[in-house]
């Protein structure tokens, strides 16, 4: 009560922020007459002046009013567009490292030019992050004339760019690119072997467009760079054939109830579990099909991988639906459909073998599983920036998450013109068929009066169902979903025309405004060299149509189902009523919708259905509250999942930082011989301790074992026994010293043969590649630890604490193994001449660079993450060109040794 009273008197935090920023807006506006009087050359010279003032000690905040006034004036001259005051406020919010919630159509692209220009003056580069390549290219090309007028360079960062072009793009003052590509470049840079192979510079300032999509919807999905693992495609096919034999059980087994089904489904958490009966039945099938020995169990250590395959196949059949969660394209590939946007995501693959299981289910070619080489979550990548900001039309519902995870405050920016869209209450029907019939009637009525309609659906399947119903009703319409997204811009351009009907999956088309009356720019662009007279004529025609649409009520939004997140619903509504235009929206629901079916209480459902007749709809405040409560519940659960992922990933992130800092150190110095020398002493002391325990009696020493170990692992001939026989006064410490000195002399002899510089390069190469190999294995070990750690809860242990403790032990082991492996490899490399070492070093580098080139940059799918809450992924294969040499096979070089004891040490 007191809080509400105080808010009324002094305003909310948002109101106070806006009041403070409006004072700076006045200051910017005061510069306008002065800047209007400047010539183009004088205006352009402002950039040089600002940079000089920064060097002299002024701050970016002190330059802000003049810099924003400069951009506004340049925009008037280049585009004939003047930034509104609310856009200046949005620009200041972004510059302060906050999130600006700006409604659709309020000009976010133009707003971003203000903080981008100001922060680019610092010379450290500004990254403007978008959700897809199309928007990155569009926004970069749209704003390029403005930035170049002011003397700034603009770059574009998209996949598959040649290395020199990408490196040059990162040197630009302002760089547009996708969230995936920025993250992958960071990972690739940390797999490079030379500084000149890196592309990124420091991460200074990022403006994230559609920040809710990138930092929240995709926060559970790690970016992964992966290479090929072993082939197990035949096993997927064989297990896939068994799954249709399993029967679903409606209720979980308990003390009172034991069903005869084989699996149960938990729709809320998107999980499927084998029952006890199911486990026994699957084991019988496995034995029959020769996949398991008689009397064996799925849960024995030797069969863990079989259990993994069964679970993946079961989830593929039960939880993942064609044309909802994925499509099969013309090339016979399973392509994931993004649950948030309805777009296809080529190149992304589900984790934990799920993608291969879906491929087996669909009978298409099964790609190999891949092994993670490097990974990072968006949460941890974007927290690397010195200053981070974002903009979106819908952030306020997630303000708490932005604040608690990223430390970003959300500021709601007022619209330039008052919002007059009419958001009508939800209507609820008993069945989906009744709901669709009502939607068709509503569309018919709107089309008759010339009002454009946008219908939002939750999946491709639903959009096609509705499309078929509209065809039967002879209503002309366009469908915008993952299957047709190459026509997206064209369909969106038509969506605002009188009487046009557009069905869009989720928020496909996001980032492109629906202009009432259609897009006159699209018509101009379709003409070859139009004259000014023709352009004016097109504009005049468009104005008439635009006014006609406004009179009919503006764009009408129909939602066919409530989403799990209120934010996605708000995004759909936000397509209408842009810049003070007329518009309306309504959601049509049925008791068969997944949100209502899963989250509405049985009592509420029975109460609603008992009093309803066929075709009858209800509008009820109680029901609306119940739906909102269900959405809040789901949002809370999803927030907890993301928070938990971050807590686990933070452990890996600390280790990632240590490994990447070590890599940076290795790459920035030419000579690591001191480090190698220090490691050699450490490793040899440890080996000697095993055979000559410190401060022990001579009778306890295993001198023969020590001699053999030194010879086998380090190629050192140290006749320790003979030394003792020759000098019985040789005490333990002196003996240790003698062994280490022998190792040093042997290594120095190698150095004299090949030359110091060549050996220095070889040491660095061995160290980097050994570190990369061990880090890759460590990631796999961390992944396995993460998957089973929740079971510690049954032993009354805290899974997170256990994960931290065990991952720390694993990491300590990695650092120790790194030392010993590098010392062993360098000790055992036998070289006769300089050319041999140079050839081997070149061979190692070529292999590593080839592996890096062929490694796949992947983004594990959000749907899989929700389903299994795992942390890593398996992805598209990289096909090996020749047969892999087994570790115990003879080495192909002809030395007569086993591969693992010869070139296997190098590779």
Swiss-Prot record:
UniProt keyword Membrane, yes or no: yes
EC number: 7.4.2.8
Organism (species): Vibrio vulnificus (strain CMCP6)
Domain of life, source organism: Bacteria
Segments of skewed composition (Basic and acidic residues): 841-853, 872-887
Keywords: ATP-binding, Cell inner membrane, Cell membrane, Cytoplasm, Membrane, Metal-binding, Nucleotide-binding, Protein transport, Translocase, Translocation, Transport, Zinc
Annotated protein name in UniProt: Protein translocase subunit SecA
Claim: Transmembrane is one of the keywords in the record: no
Compositional bias of kind Low complexity: 854-865
